[in-house]
Amino acid sequence: MSRENNCTTADLAWGIPSITQAWGLWALFGVVTMLLLISLAALLSQWTRGRRRTQEEQGPPSGRSVEEVPLYGNLHYLQTGRLSEESRSEEQDPSSGGLARGAEEATCYTSLQLRPAQGRIPSSGTPIKYCEVVLDSEPKPQASGPEPELYASVCAQTRRARASFPDQAYANSQPAPS
């Protein structure tokens, strides 16, 4: 049997019948294609809506854009290269005390802790624990050289009974004059 005997001139290509010969097959193909496209459009719509909703819930703190939120604390405005819009307008009007307020806002502080989601009640966070300066009277055996005797101890619960320096402002400063 040769292939030419089975093939008619009404075929679009080998094995694909024309619309007049198999209109029901082409109609079914069209319906399935339309349902597939509608399903794809609905899926993309739900995906973008859900993504937009999660971005609104997890958005930047206090309504500011991500570029405005500093990553590290204690950045002076000369180091960052920009001022806030409020301090720029206040520096232009010195009669309202804008220069003093602009100088106060020159240093930025931020917390590197994650903020709670906007739907929850914010907690007070962990309280700040201050350092104590203590004198280490126990010598440590080390051959590399002498270590300094004064050091700052963070959360030094076990060393609190040792000597502290209440009359000095800082660990390495001179005693307060009497």
UniProtKB/Swiss-Prot annotation:
Lymph node, spleen and thymus. GO terms for cellular component: plasma membrane. Residues 128-133 are annotated as: Interaction with PTPN11. It comes from the Eukaryota. It is a single-pass type III membrane protein. Residues 81-102 are annotated as: Disordered. Residues 151-154 are annotated as: Interaction with CSK. Signal peptide: none annotated. The chain crosses the membrane at residues 24-44. Negatively regulates T-cell antigen receptor (TCR)-mediated signaling. Involved in positive selection of T-cells. This is Signaling threshold-regulating transmembrane adapter 1. The gene is Sit1.
